[in-house]
UniProtKB/Swiss-Prot annotation:
GO MF annotation terms: ATP binding; medium-chain fatty acid-CoA ligase activity
Protein's recorded name: Putative acyl-CoA synthetase YngI
Family classification: Belongs to the ATP-dependent AMP-binding enzyme family.
Assigned EC number: 6.2.1.-
Chain's gene name: yngI
GO BP: fatty acid metabolic process
Domain of life from the UniProt record: Bacteria
Assigned keywords, A-Z: ATP-binding, Ligase, Nucleotide-binding
Binding locations of ATP: 198-206, 423, 438, 529
Length: 549
């Protein structure tokens, strides 16, 4: 077990650049971008100096609203070098969500790209901040956002009231190496360096405050569990704005000197092409991404023989999908990670050398230097091994707290430092965990507790089912009933009654879904988490069920 790293993100990148100056750090094959670690650290230093000259101070909150572009990576490490707090913004946000985040985060700066999937970011920003039209770059005075002074635009034109990205390079020349060093030397490993907003699968997002120490060590432990080395080349199709991208992807690579090959926007063909062209050895993804890749009609046309490992995480990982990834994609050492943003994010992970069964059927065991226990929900009383309860964790990875929300922080972390995840789990005698559901997802039908994950795993075995999500909906007689939202495999068909008949005699009668709905897509957050509360709302509306029944 490696020792904990007592450093800052900026220093970590420097150390890696010193150790592997000529190795690939960042590669965008479609944009003809290829930085070695020495070049990448130089770019991040330049960006850091530019941000300093733009007036970004230590502790200032810098929001970035962009997809997986190279500038995002430069900002991640530049803000870390100058002690600013990186606030990540979901690429799918519209005006309402951006307004909430800018207010709640007290952002001093906002960096935007031009557009994402048809949404013009400058149009949204100008609608929220009319003062930009008369403002000088770096001198915004907004009634709505009193902290916000600086906007930076990444695009091919200049916009009123905003710096252009190229200005970071120009202004960097007016800041000396000594000034940057002085700033870096003033930083502490326990400074908050990142605010990730929870994905909003249940309500208003909360700003999770993470430190250098939190994320560096989580990333290094993740890399250790995967047996990641400087020889590896990681394809990163998961979004940078989520911990999956910027910690399990970016920081894990930097911790060992591996190459990062990001995909700007997820598309299964782009991922398959990237893996083949860049001979990637590592591929990350949420289950829906792997499903899309495996079921693409041209899947067999791509050479994926270099793939060795990766992480499947972000939502429950169906065992059938894991088996297909191992057998058809050749990812023999793939691992499953489980966690949440509040834990930097990984809590448990399978190891590359774990048995096939453990890597397919569990979410692994606690990361090094962390503790995990399963407790009776609503208490701190630990349950016996093999019994279900709420998963709690303690260690270096637990967040500093929710920004401006002490009440929510107190509810999440007790006085002994245990983080209560809200996830139901079972731990075996060897410490391996299985996530069995969310406390909030559990439904009670006629006094019987039903866990959606159990029904989902069963329905995955049906030959026509590609994906399935089960939610609880109100029922006048039983209190709640199960509703299954099904995605079918191409060319396959099955009726709701046939699916119910398939369940009879194989799972308990009270677990058989009362409602079966077929769909092509699930409502998702941009980080790939399925928004079950929206499926519940849709079911209630479709079947005219009363939410108060």
């Amino acid at each position: 077990m490696a020792e904990l790293i007592h450093s800052t993100i900026g220093r970590l990148l420097e150390q890696t650049a010193d150790a592997y100056p000529d190795r690939d750090a960042v590669v965008y094959p479609d944009r003809n971008i290829r930085y070695t670690y020495a070049q990448f650290d130089s770019l991040c230093r330049q960006t850091a100096k530019g941000l300093m000259r733009m007036g970004i101070g230590k502790g200032d909150h810098v929001a970035i609203w962009a997809s997986n572009i190279s500038e995002w990576l430069a900002v991640q490490f530049a803000t870390a070098k100058i002690g600013a707090v990186l606030v990540t913004v979901n690429t799918n946000y519209q005006a309402h969500e951006l307004d909430y985040l800018l207010k709640q985060s007290d952002a001093a700066a906002l960096i935007i790209m031009d557009s994402y999937r048809g949404t013009s970011y400058p149009d949204i920003v100008n609608s929220l901040i009319p003062e930009l039209q008369e403002a000088k770059p770096g001198q915004l005075k907004s009634e709505r956002y009193p902290f916000l002074k600086t906007l930076i635009y990444i695009g091919n034109k200049r916009l009123s009231g905003m710096y252009h990205w190229d200005d970071t390079e120009i202004l960097a020349k007016t800041v000396t190496d000594a000034e940057l060093e002085e700033r870096m030397n003033s930083l502490d490993k326990d400074n908050v360096i990142n605010m990730q907003y929870t994905s909003g699968t249940t309500g208003f997002p909360k700003g999770v405050m993470l430190t250098h120490f939190n994320v560096i060590n989580n990333a290094a432990n993740i890399a250790e569990c995967m047996a990641l080395t400087s020889q590896d080349r990681m394809c990163i199709p998961v979004p940078f704005f989520h911990c999956f991208g910027c910690v399990l992807g970016v920081l894990a690579c930097v911790s060992v000197g591996a190459a990062m090959i990001p995909v700007q926007e997820f598309d299964p063909v782009t991922v398959l092409k990237t893996v083949e062209k860049e001979k990637c050895t590592v591929l990350h993804g949420v289950p829906t991404m792997f499903i899309a890749e495996l079921h693409h009609p041209d899947f067999d046309a791509y050479d994926l023989s270099t793939l060795r490992t990766g992480i499947m995480a972000g939502s429950p990982c169906p065992s059938e999908v894991m088996k297909a990834v191992i057998e058809r994609m050749g990812m023999k050492d793939i691992t499953i990670a489980y966690g949440q943003t509040e834990a930097s994010p990984v809590i448990t992970q399978t190891r590359a050398n774990d048995s096939f069964i453990r890597r397919v059927e569990t979410t692994g065991r606690a990361l090094p230097h962390t503790e995990v226990k399963i407790v009776e929900p609503g208490t701190c009383q630990e349950v016996q091994r093999g019994m279900q309860g709420e998963l709690c964790t303690r260690g270096y990875h637990v967040m500093k707290g929710y920004y401006k929300d002490k009440d929510a922080t107190r509810k999440a972390i007790n006085h002994d430092g245990w983080l209560f995840t809200g996830d139901l789990a079972v731990m075996d005698e060897d410490g391996y965990c299985r996530i069995t559901g969310r406390l909030k997802d559990m439904l009670i039908r006629g006094g019987e507790n039903i866990y959606p994950r159990e029904i989902e795993e069963f329905l995955y075995q049906h030959p026509a089912v590609l994906d399935v999500q089960v939610v609880g909906v109100p029922d006048a007689k039983f209190g709640e009933e199960a509703a299954a939202w099904i995605k079918l495999k191409d060319g396959k068909s099955v009726s709701p009654d046939e699916l119910k008949a398939y369940c009879k005699g194989k799972i308990a009668r009270h677990k058989i879904p009362r409602y079966v709905i077929f769909t092509d897509d699930y409502p998702m957050t941009a980080s790939g988490k399925i928004q079950k509360y929206k499926l519940r709302e849709k079911t209630i509306e479709m079947f005219n069920l009363s939410s108060s029944q």
